Amino acid sequence: MKFDTVIMGGGLAGLLCGLQLQQHGLRCAIVTRGQSALHFSSGSLDLLSALPDGQPVTDITAGLDALRRQAPEHPYSRLGAQKVLTLAQQAQTLLNASGAQLYGDVQQAHQRVTPLGTLRSTWLSSPEVPVWPLSAQRICVVGVSGLLDFQAHLAAASLRQRDLNVETAEIDLPELDVLRDNPTEFRAVNIARLLDNEEKWPLLYDALSPIATNCDMIIMPACFGLANDTLWRWLNERLPCALTLLPTLPPSVLGIRLHNQLQRQFVRQGGIWMPGDEVKKVTCRHGTVSEIWTRNHADIPLRPRFAVLASGSFFSSGLVAEREGIREPILGLDVQQTATRAEWYQQHFFDPQPWQQFGVVTDDAFRPSLAGNTVENLYAIGSVLAGFDPIAEGCGGGVCAVSALQAAHHIAERAGEQQ
């Protein structure tokens, strides 16, 4: 099977790269093993929240300039501030065109409220998510009886420290009892599958309506809206106060929705989606990828003009830690890591951990190297890249988006030259 590009990995980076390549008229396939890290995320995307020295970032342009001085090998630093901002804006446009209506400004971070009621700097958020400063003084944090993925009293306690009048309440929906037989089934995603049925909407409205008359804003867990935000908008039009949603413990409704919106758009535009499959071997000839062998297509290789590695980091098995060191399991690419295992981590758990910055070695075009030699038609994007800490620096989503579009532009340019 011949393709212009085969992308190994169906997470945020892989999907955005595929969508951008489709804009250039290239035929793409995505090989994906299972759920991506988006299923376990908040659904919000960070661009740059903090510098390596711990300094928080609000002005993104100034933050990118400072980042280049502190971390010259960071993926952003390799591109330059203006290029990062341009690609981030393009990514935001691409997300919105795919149906993921995320709001934010590439120049200025905003503060979203987290499930614990604290604030986190971010780039893009769903319209349901409450953003600081809140537009209300009287707030009620509402939990769902029996839902362990969200603790209303913890969020309320944090918000009260910000001089807000915050109460808590709990709604009990007997219609959800079918899920209570097994506590592991009473999760936000399973609740959403029931509540998203239009016939159930009035039940949720009836439960929230008495609470809404006594406050200016309701904050509740995101336990509906797997496909879109229609129910949230329907409730907001009818309730006498604003309704906002907080992501829950994983799996996350908002994260799954974002992934599904991008995946559906990729398929609608003619992309080949290969779920439940896994790349087992990649054949390289003369420094280029010539064939990609997958588990489900055992004796039928995929033959791409270009290949993209978007396999993620340790969480997605894009990187594997062994006693002897860190390795990239698909091609055995060169990996940036510390010399000894003892240097992988810091003693204090909440300190920035060196292993977070491990990843494949690439040139400035994000082409990785194998035994010191650049693989000419292979690009690495997203969390598999080296040189950044997605947790401490708050840049995971941004690196995925920016590197994906940068690689897509490179491929499109080279594909045009080869025609």
From Swiss-Prot:
Catalytic activity: a quinone + sn-glycerol 3-phosphate = dihydroxyacetone phosphate + a quinol
Keyword presence, Manganese: no
Biological process terms in GO annotation: glycerol catabolic process
Enzyme Commission number(s) from the entry: 1.1.5.3
GO CC annotation, single: glycerol-3-phosphate dehydrogenase (FAD) complex
Pfam families assigned: FAD_binding_2
GO molecular function annotation: glycerol-3-phosphate dehydrogenase (quinone) activity
Gene3D superfamilies referenced in this protein's UniProt entry, alphabetically: FAD/NAD(P)-binding domain (3.50.50.60)
Function: Conversion of glycerol 3-phosphate to dihydroxyacetone. Uses fumarate or nitrate as electron acceptor.
Known partners and oligomeric status: Composed of a catalytic GlpA/B dimer and of membrane bound GlpC.
Protein's name according to its UniProt entry: Anaerobic glycerol-3-phosphate dehydrogenase subunit B
Organism, as annotated: Salmonella paratyphi B (strain ATCC BAA-1250 / SPB7)
Gene giving rise to this polypeptide: glpB
